C-alpha cells in the first residue's frame, strides 16, 4: 500500500456526528468521493440513524435534524455501505486521525465489523505543504487554494470539497516529485514525534552571508518538515 502511486484511486470522506466523543456519540452522515488520476469520479452519501437524539446545537451546526435520520440506515448498515463504496481504497479525510477515523472505528467495533484502515490525513499534509496559514481548517485551505466555496458541516458537501482539495494537493506533490503514498511521509513529513515535544523560542544571529544562507535552510526545514502549529527545529 505504501508504494501505491499517487495517480491511483483514493476514497475521500467526511462524517457528521451527534458530538465529539466517539465513545458516547454516533454517526449521523457519511459522505465520500472516489478520486482517480487526480479527478473526482464517483460520489457516495448516506444519513445514519444514530443511537441517540440529535441535539438542537448539533442540528444548528450540521443542518441535520432528527426527522432527516429517522428512516435512515442504522450504524452497521450505513458503515457496510460505505466500506463497499471505498472497496479497500486508501481513505482520505481532514483531521482523520483525531476525528473521522476514530468515529468509524467506534462504529465498526459496536457493529462487529473488522476495520483497520490505511488512511491519509490532509490536515497534517496541509501543515507540511502550505506553511504559514493562520489555521488549517478545511475551509481555510480551500480558500488558500482558490477553490469554489461550499456549504461546510454537511458530509456530502465537505467530502466533495475535500476531494477537490486533495486533487490539488496531488498536483502539488507531483511538482515536489512525491509520487507514492510513502513519499508523503518521507518527502514531506520529517519525524512526527519531534512535533509533539515541548518547544522553546530561539533567536539566531548570523555573522556573515554564509551564516545567513544556512539560517534560510534551517527556516525552510522548520516550515516544511517540522511544522506543527509553529515552525520547529529539532535539536
Predicted regions and their residues:
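Phosphodiester-processing cores and adjacent nucleic acid-binding clamps
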Residues: 11, 92, 97, 102-235
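Conserved non-catalytic scaffold segment of RNase H-like nuclease domains
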Residues: 1-117, 131-153
